[in-house]
Amino acid sequence: MYKIDFNNPIHIHFIGIGGISMSGLAKILLSKGFSVSGSDSHSSALTDELIGDGCLVSVPQSAGNITNDIDLVVYTAAIHPDNPEFKAAKEAGLPMLTRAELLGQIMTVYKNAINIAGTHGKTTTTSMVSEILLAASMDPTISVGGILNSIGGNTRVGGDNYFVAEACEYTNSFLSFNPTMNIILNVKEDHLDFFKDIDDIRHSFKLFTEKLPSDGTLIINTDIDNYEYFYQDTDCEVITFGSDPAKSMYSASDIAYDELGRCTYSLLINGEKADTITLGVPGLHNVYNSLAAIAATRKLSVDMEHIKAGLSNFKGTNRRFEKKGTFNGVTVIDDYAHHPDEIRATLSSAAHYPHNRVWVVFQPHTYSRTKLLFNEFADALSHADKVVLAKIYAARETDTLGISSADLCEKIKSLGKECVYIDNFEDIEKYLLKNCINGDLLITMGAGDIYKVGEDLLK
């Protein structure tokens, strides 16, 4: 693998520079004196911002963008081998790195590289850690998978002491990283188009733990089945958090909710009350996300007052139980949930939010996930009062598994719940306008483009 010398900046070209993660990495390299160019299929606010920062951005992509002065090419997993720039770079014999490989090398510049991993909660917990470090004026560099309002995007270029990064397991991306601290929030079945089964996923997270140096730190949830497995072959420091104070260094008690579902709780350290924490985001799941953030930042020597301030300041990221507005007295929430556990967590948050009936407008994400977690999806969605299903969002897949949203609709109805399947957004919007009433809570849910339904209703 090509090794970047950060003391000798070179010209790096990004294929697909308009992506939220790629654009952030480009900004970090620009701040370190590198010459950066890139291309994408279309212009966007992100590419315009990069141009303003001094980056040469070409639209559309073409072989001619691979010029003789380029020293290294970076590409994402989404780039197909027949992409004209990918082919041209290969033919020119240029060194090439994936996005994950580049991110891993960038981490080596920082004294503390904090990676937040898990099937669920990565974006939120990465944001919580970031908000705490910002509250403590520790000038972190941040790479998060959502829009964090306090930094005006998904990336913040800070000093060289702290790099906070969301670490995704898909295609084993996080195995290219170079962490000094890893947080593992949970390990569940997901991305089964890549992983064989839950054992394969667990093995990947174990390898992720083994990336830590002997003086590194693992922060892990004791609610994960056989959590000791992940660090049995490492000699790094282990700090635990979870629901059981008997086996967790960090836990919570006396959890209470305000009128918007936001939690206040007693922080327990080694079973003893240490402080009272108030969160700025709703949901029981965020209590446990915050415990991980507290464990990480206390290890980084942040005092409790700054920890409490950071957690209170954090009001959420885009598409994580995000209030969009109201129409006809109906409150519209948008959420990225696309896994049964995430759906349950979102509906748990909704239970503490003022509402008459809870509507979920769900767009399943990928055929493989829908097929493999079919019964779990039906069970999770059955906890809503009313369910509307959109077509499956294919993403990177084609329909070869014989599964549809209509099948899921029938399964939900067999559980005694009201559910309809409507195959286009326009008719979904008409149905909701006709059937939602004053005081209802409407949640658009999924990792695709279902958020457009809520936005259209609010126009």
From Swiss-Prot:
GO MF annotation, one: ATP binding
Coiled-coil region: none
GO term, biological process aspect, one: cell wall organization
Uppermost EC category: ligase
Pfam family, one: Mur_ligase_C
Reactions accelerated catalytically: UDP-N-acetyl-alpha-D-muramate + L-alanine + ATP = UDP-N-acetyl-alpha-D-muramoyl-L-alanine + ADP + phosphate + H(+)
Keyword vocabulary terms for this entry: ATP-binding, Cell cycle, Cell division, Cell shape, Cell wall biogenesis/degradation, Cytoplasm, Ligase, Nucleotide-binding, Peptidoglycan synthesis
Pathway(s) served: Cell wall biogenesis; peptidoglycan biosynthesis
Subcellular location: Cytoplasm
Main location: cytoplasm
Disulphide-bonded residues: none
EC code: 6.3.2.8
GO CC field: cytoplasm
Binding positions for ATP per the UniProt entry: G118, T119, H120, G121, K122, T123, T124
Function field: Cell wall formation.
Similarity field: Belongs to the MurCDEF family.
UniProt xrefs under NCBIfam families: murC
Name of the protein: UDP-N-acetylmuramate--L-alanine ligase
Encoding gene (name): murC
